[in-house]
Amino acid sequence: LGADPRPGDKSWRTDTIMVVAIDYQKDIPGGRPQIGVISVPRDLWVNIPGYGNGRINQADYIGEGRKPNGGGPALVSEILNNTLGVRTTRYVRIRQEGLVELVDALGGVTVTLDCPLNELTPNGRGGYNRFNLPAGENFLDGAAAKKFATFRYASNDFSRASRQQQLIWAIRERALQIDAIPNIPQLWQALSKTFTTDLSLLDVIRFARLGSQLDADQVHGVVFSTRALANTVMSGGAQVLIIRSRSALMAEVDSLFAGKPIADQLPNLAGFTS
């Protein structure tokens, strides 16, 4: 869960929601572990139990009022199960400044683009802040990585989700390059004010070691297509994504471990996947 609390605002939205699944393939002779990442669009219109219909990015904040029932992550998990048939058991919630600090702690990351990226985000003064990258390899510090992962007004959620998955892979590659796993306890301490999780430090180290041992073809990603989801405008004017075809949606969820590796998927900078 990627949260974006604003200064002076006690509420927040989780504009980044990723489901990470691991298939250890322990029962398959010669099986190799596979990791799958599903990006859930922030504007997906869902039923929020106990609240009504709304964007899925509202659910984490709404659920935080239900601490005895697991809070926001538990409510998001319930919605993911109801909507996608995906059951989640653990969570990590990180604020945007946590991403900035992590990338800077690694000394920056490199992403490769097959065409220029020209993105926008509102600046709060009636205009836009711009973020431009040329085609080819681009080095990103923490501030640039945040823009790469969050700007979307020149494209849409589909493009941003694709970029977010590529950024996760770039972070993994950089962590391996500098042998960062032994420094995870120090990173945990340094970033502790920017994230919450029900994982222990030992859990994180164990998952990091698993990730470091995987080849590129063992890490897959799903960004939902326009076969599954469609843009619409609600009666109140809200622009949201609704499920166009449940069968197509579930087929894309089921393809999680069969899709192209994240490392082979350049960001869909033009917008929608088809």
Question: How would you name each of these model-derived features?
Answer:
Residues 1-274:
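Non-catalytic, solvent-exposed segments at the cell envelope interface
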